[in-house]
Structure formats: C-alpha cells, structure tokens
Amino acid sequence: MKSLKELYKIGRGPSSSHTIGPERVAYYAVETFGKGDYTAELFGSLALTGKGHGTDRVLKEVLGENTKIIFDARAKELKHPNTLKLYKTENGENVLVCTAQSVGGGSVVINGKPYPDTPDVYPQKNFAAVRKFIEENNLSLPDYVKFYEPDVFFYLKNVWNAMKESVERGLRKDGVLPGALRLERKAKTLYFAEAKFETSVMRENRKLASYAFAVAEENADNGIIVTAPTCGAAGILPAVLYYMYRDNNVPEEEILNALAAAGVVGNVVKQNASISGAECGCQAEVGVACSMAAAALSSIFCLDSDGVECSAEIALEHNLGLTCDPVLGLVQIPCIERNAVAAIEAVNAVTLSKSLKNKRKISFDNVVKVMYETGKDMNTRYRETSTGGLASLYGSDADK
C-alpha cells in the first residue's frame, strides 16, 4: 500500500476526481511537453458532471485560458469512467500527448502508469494482514504507521491543521454557494440552532453535524480541504476529529494518531476496491469516509484491533449500495447533508462496536470486497453521472 501522503491530499474542492486529479494531469502535461495550445477531451463521468465540478476551470487555469474543452458524454467502453485525453497543437495538428484516468481521491493514472509512480510503503495488502502484523508485534494501528512511515506524522500535522481550518472557516461563513442551485450555507445556523427540549444527545449530534457541514460547504465553495478519502466526503473525518478535539479536549497527539489509524483503513479500501464515486457510487466515498472516521474514533478510545475493525466494518457495511447522484452535477445535494449524517453514523458505529466486537461474523475485508462488487454492478446512472436518482428528479413537481 502507498504512503498516507497519497491518501490525504491538501487541495481545493469541489471534487478530488474532477478537479484535483485533472489538475495533476494538466501539470504533468505542462512539465513534460511545455506550454502551448492544448485541447482536453473528457469522457464518462468527467464529461457528464465535469462542468458542475469545475473540471474545465482547473484545466484552463493550468493549461491556459484558450484551452479547448470537449465534453464527450457518449456511452463507450472506458478503462475508468473518469477518463481524459490531452492534445497539444504542433505544426497545426492536434497531437495526443496523454491519456489519463482520475481514479479517485485525486490520484491519477497517466499513459497506463500511476502518477507519480511511488513505491509501496506498507507491504500488507489487506486488513487481515495488517491485523496479523500488529497483533504479532503488539502494536496499535498508529504504531503500525510509525513502524513503516515514521516521517509521515509531520505531514499529518499539516493535514490536521488544514482540516481544522476548514471547519473553522466554514462555521464563520454565511451566504450562497456557487452554482445554479443557489444553496445557502447552513453550518453556522446549525451550530447555533438550539431547539426547545433539545436533549444532550441531540445537541452533540447537531454540533458534530455542523462541523461536517462546515467542511463540505467549504469544499463546494472551491475552498482548501483534505481528501479523506475524497473531496466529496471531506467533511466526515474532520468533523469527528474536531468534535473530539474541541468539545472533548482530546490532545493533538491523539488526533494525529487517529488520522494515522483512519489512513490505514482508507488505504486498505483504495488498495482492494475503489474510492471513486464514478466507479462505485457514493458508498466508495461517503461510505469509506464514514469507515475511516469510525476507525479514528476507535483509536482515540484505545480500542483493540478487533474493536477498530468492527467499527470500520459496521460503518462501511451500512453504506453499501449508496448511490452517487449529485443534483446539477454539483457537490452540494445530497453531498453536504450526507457528510453530516455519515459523521453521526461513524460515532454510532463505534458505540455499537464497543459491545458487539466479540460477536461479529463479517470481516472488514469482506465488506470492502462486497462494496467493490456492488459498485461494479451499479447502473451508471447512479455513479456520478447526474443522470439518475435525485439528479434526474430534481425540479419535478414534488420538489416545488
């Protein structure tokens, strides 16, 4: 498995696969072939939702404002639903310089090879192998990360700072998010919206939800966030960590350890399945983020490896089949609210795990396998194409 630096990327929203990934491809082209007149041809989900996700905007920012963008949404066989081709004009002709796939979380494959093509850091390939190693060596998941990648904790400090800042920025802001939905920011309102007869549990859930709203709204507004594991699901892990840090006085060192534990879970999914909504639906984004947040909270509570696995498994299992159907191709409805719901789900998964970990029958690795199979079976209308689900019904009489 790769470095946690390849999982947690600090960048701009609204979409890791549709903005951060294509931006990487564009920088590769400029660094390799130089500046000039480029044409970008987008296929699959990039063509269908690229406009709403800002793919054309980031490509023009890197390649030049005169870059021609072609959205080819025709159905065709693709190696990955997020495929793009870049052409450079040479002697009056368009010459193909690269074919790339944005495979999720801002990671890209260019001309058949991962870019950058970094070596594996962690030799284990699944959670069972990770568990075997840490139990044989009496380690925790954060210890496991320290064993193979000790220097990454300096990077995780930057990741945590970026997460924390995105929560705090989002809580301060009012106004309307960009795009035709004209969606109002709700994080600040939610944070202060104490209701009559509100129970202590409801109050804590509301605060937790407001933190997730804050980050997800920053993401939708092209703000700086962290892929965890993606931009579309970027509010879930920061919400849980910020809640423990600010409202429960968990020290920063434990937050960084929790980030490491969550990163291992995210890496296992990335290695064995997908974190791309265009490939496997929202279960691969929000579902995996929920699982990562549950693992992080389990680490803070010092649960053993069985407890961590049980928490992560519960969180992912109950997001199986979750569709990706962004309205108008924007990372707003249902994405923002879904981040908040998943943050609460992550806490509930840990609550269940504390009591049920010794009685479970399903492994995390098997849930990951099922998630991938489910995603592959899912109709393309529900895989980030905005042609099915909520995206296809928005604006009907029922929504008026």
Where are these regions (language model features)?
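Alpha-helical support elements that line or immediately flank enzyme active sites
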Residues: 19-31, 238-249, 294-302
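Functionally critical mobile loop/hinge segments
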Residues: 297-400
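C-terminal regulatory domains involved in ligand/effector binding and gene-expression control
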Residues: 65-197, 207
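Conserved phosphate/anionic-ligand binding catalytic regions in large, soluble enzymes, centered on
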Residues: 8-28, 221-240, 282-290
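Short beta-alpha connecting loops at secondary-structure transitions
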Residues: 9-11, 276-281, 326-335
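Non-transmembrane, aqueous-exposed alpha-helical and coiled segments at domain scale
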Residues: 1-9, 23-46, 52-53, 63, ...
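Accessory "access/gating" subregions that flank catalytic or transport cores
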Residues: 164-249, 253-267, 274-277, 281, ...
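Contiguous, well-ordered alpha-helical segments that form the cores/surfaces of helical PPI scaffolds
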Residues: 210, 214, 235-245, 260-268, ...
